[in-house]
């Protein structure tokens, strides 16, 4: 039975990862500018072009379907041409893997940077993610995979739960959950729940960490604690020098 479930799961995962033909990014990345500004601890959001990307974008009502963490060159991980792997990501059917930055040059991307995070904590965040390379996605969990095959539409109040449904095993991680857990390791907020102390003498906001499995790629975009870094203007921009 286990072999059969695993086979069915792999077939579903393969179907979900197939690219949708005709994808053209509205605003493609500028590779050289991106490579020149990205720093360890930055979160790279991606507008994907496979079947699961379209479903995630619908469920999250967002442009972004995937997130990867930039950690800098990883020892022993490189492309055949020598380009180092610098990203950690979790993909359905693959689990937690590393990748070169060039993987996402053809895509529409956004760079999100944690504000005020110390060098030591950045290092901890990156090391947390690197140590999880090899964590898998359990293709035997058909229910977990089938959530992406549910006919649309899905009521709005269920959409975030649809992303997290079936999760629970700490070694089976989706992309945004992996990154959320890495920042949780240093208690850096993304989109915490906020409550207010009842006492008048203690009027202050109290932040509560959300379940990491409920995070979506777009949460890094809308988080008040992450800066949006636009590579083409970060070092200055002269609109008069443009020819258009």
Where are these regions (language model features)?
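Cysteine-nucleophile amide-bond enzymes
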Residues: 1-244
């Amino acid at each position: 039975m286990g072999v059969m479930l695993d086979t069915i799961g792999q077939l579903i995962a393969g179907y979900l990862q197939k690219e949708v033909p005709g994808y053209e990014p509205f605003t493609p990345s500028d590779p050289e500018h991106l490579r020149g500004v990205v720093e360890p601890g930055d979160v790279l959001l991606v507008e994907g072009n496979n079947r699961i990307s379209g479903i995630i974008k619908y469920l999250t009502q967002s442009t972004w379907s995937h997130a990867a963490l930039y950690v800098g060159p990883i020892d022993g991980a490189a492309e055949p041409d020598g380009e180092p792997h610098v990203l950690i990501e979790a993909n359905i059917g693959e689990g937690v893997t590393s990748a070169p930055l060039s993987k996402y040059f053809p895509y529409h991307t956004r760079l999100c940077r944690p504000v005020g995070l110390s060098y030591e904590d950045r290092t901890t965040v990156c090391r947390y993610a690197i140590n999880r390379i090899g964590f898998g996605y359990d293709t035997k969990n058909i229910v977990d995979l089938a959530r992406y095959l549910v006919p649309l539409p899905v009521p709005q109040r269920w959409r975030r739960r649809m992303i997290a449904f079936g999760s629970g095993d700490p070694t089976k991680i989706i992309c945004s959950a992996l990154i959320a857990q890495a920042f949780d390791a240093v208690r850096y907020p993304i989109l915490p729940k906020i409550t207010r102390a009842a006492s008048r003498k203690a009027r202050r906001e109290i932040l509560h960490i959300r379940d990491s499995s409920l995070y979506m790629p777009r949460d890094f975009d809308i988080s008040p604690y992450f800066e949006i870094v636009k590579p083409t203007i970060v070092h200055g921009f002269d609109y008069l020098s443009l020819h258009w």
